[in-house]
A protein has these predicted regions:
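Iron-sulfur-cluster electron-transfer modules
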Residues: 19-22, 39, 49-220, 225-232, ...
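Short cysteine clusters
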Residues: 25-31, 35, 67-73, 77-78, ...
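Ferredoxin-type iron-sulfur electron-transfer modules in oxidoreductases and energy-metabolism complexes
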Residues: 2-17, 38-66, 70-72, 80-113, ...
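A broadly conserved sequence feature marking short terminus-proximal activation segments
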Residues: 1-3, 23-45, 277-281
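Cofactor-cradling patches in redox/metallo enzymes
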Residues: 151-243, 274-291, 296-390
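Short, structured patches in soluble enzyme cores that scaffold and shape functional sites
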Residues: 147, 243-245, 271
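C-terminal amphipathic alpha-helical segment
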Residues: 253-289
Length: 390
């Protein structure tokens, strides 16, 4: 009994941390076949699940921190094993034991102190909006725009928040932001294993939404969309949530947004993991892009359910990935391979990783990386003044 007890305790800890899915696994190895890591280095999700089954989690190794939670393995699994849940359970156990990569520790500190992973002042969260006629949210407004952390602070991603605001203003949408009242949604730090910090961030956000009379939330990030839609209900919070790619289609179909300018470029669309595989949103972004005059949409071979992860999920966006192991480099090659001039996506993490990969190219101008809102902003053009000059 004495030799079995430690393993049983570990198994109980894994179950308590949400990793009980290992019980369904019969070690067929399909997860390893589809995992993007195996395109760039050896990695076995099957081995991690096996460790869970035997109560022998290797929480001090690097492997438990590699998973990007892209969703490819549960999609391919014939038994429907939630392999990502097993990985996250290992991370929770490791975090509780004080074992985690330094970047994750730094991020947790930043989130706890300022409500964002960058450690930027909370008081400046809404500063991006000052030049774009964006009002503070008040009860009764049509929608709350929740840009997320990186569009609020990162110089490249601020352009996405600005494009979104400009589009909403052009469409006559009555919207506002909460600015410094917002926290990070908490999705990625939860997947990185810090469950208690996630709960704190989520509860503070939910309180801010309720206190300000929020009913409908518009998001730029699929990670925010996923968390608000699928995880905040754990706290009995149910708000209507819509991703900008979906809302764009609604505005266009309702006649509130006119795409009049031609965009004569060949583009390809990258399905973000948390918009596509995790939430099934594939058609709306494509329907929006198809309505842009002059735009030619070319599909990559790995599209929709088979989309190649950019490498940013599961907390990996905060960790350095060595050159030669970046999924985003492979994705950029795929985009160029189909003759695309622009790689379009709808996720801040994807844009960050693709921009880094683009800048590492010998000819970094060979392809552009854009958010779908930036394309639509160009398609609606500048607002023309009334004939009387008003």
């Amino acid at each position: 009994v004495e030799t079995v007890a430690p393993f049983k305790e570990a198994i109980d800890a894994i179950k308590e941390a949400g990793g009980e899915a290992y019980k369904l696994c019969y070690q067929c190895g399909m997860c390893d076949t589809v995992c993007p890591w195996n395109r760039v280095r050896d990695f076995s999700m099957r081995r991690i699940v096996r460790q869970a089954a035997f109560g022998l989690p290797e929480i001090e190794g690097e492997d438990i921190w590699r998973c990007t939670t892209c969703g490819s393995c549960p999609q391919a699994c014939p038994r429907g094993v939630g392999t990502m849940d097993v990985t996250v359970s290992f991370r929770r156990i490791a975090s509780e034991a004080g074992i985690f990569p330094p970047p994750i520790h730094t991020t947790s500190v930043n989130l706890g102190a300022e409500g964002n992973p960058l450690g930027e002042p909370r008081s400046q969260r809404g500063d991006w909006a000052k030049e774009h006629s964006v009002k503070p949210f008040t009860e009764g407004m049509e929608i709350l725009y929740f840009p997320g952390c990186y569009p609020s602070y990162d110089p490249r991603l601020k352009k996405v928040a600005a494009a979104t605001a400009n589009i909403l203003n052009r469409a006559g949408v009555d919207f506002g932001i909460l600015g410094e009242k917002e926290n990070c949604c908490g999705e990625s730090i939860r997947k990185a294993g810090d469950e208690e910090l996630f709960k704190r961030l989520a509860k503070e956000n939910i309180k801010a939404f309720i206190d300000n009379g929020v009913k409908k939330i518009l998001v730029s990030s699929p990670h925010c969309y996923h968390t608000f839609t699928n995880e905040y209900p754990e706290f009995r919070a149910n708000f209507e949530v819509i991703h900008m790619s979906q809302y764009l289609l609604e505005l266009i179909n309702a006649g509130r947004l006119k795409l009049t300018n031609e965009y004569k470029k060949k583009i390809t669309y990258h399905d973000p993991c948390y918009l596509g595989r995790h939430n099934g949103i594939y058609d709306e972004p494509r329907e929006v892009l198809k309505q842009v005059p002059g735009l030619e949409l070319i599909e990559m071979e790995e599209a929709r359910e088979d989309s190649l992860c950019c490498g940013g999920g599961g907390g990996r966006i905060w960790m350095e990935t060595p050159k030669g192991e970046r999924f985003s480099d492979l994705r950029l090659q795929q985009a160029r391979g189909v003759g695309a001039e622009v790689l379009v996506t709808a996720c801040p993490y994807c844009i960050m990783n693709f921009e880094d990969s683009r800048l590492s190219l010998e000819d970094s101008e060979a392809i552009e990386v854009k958010d779908i809102t930036e394309i639509i902003q160009e398609a609606i053009g500048e607002e023309k003044p009334d004939k009387d000059g008003a």
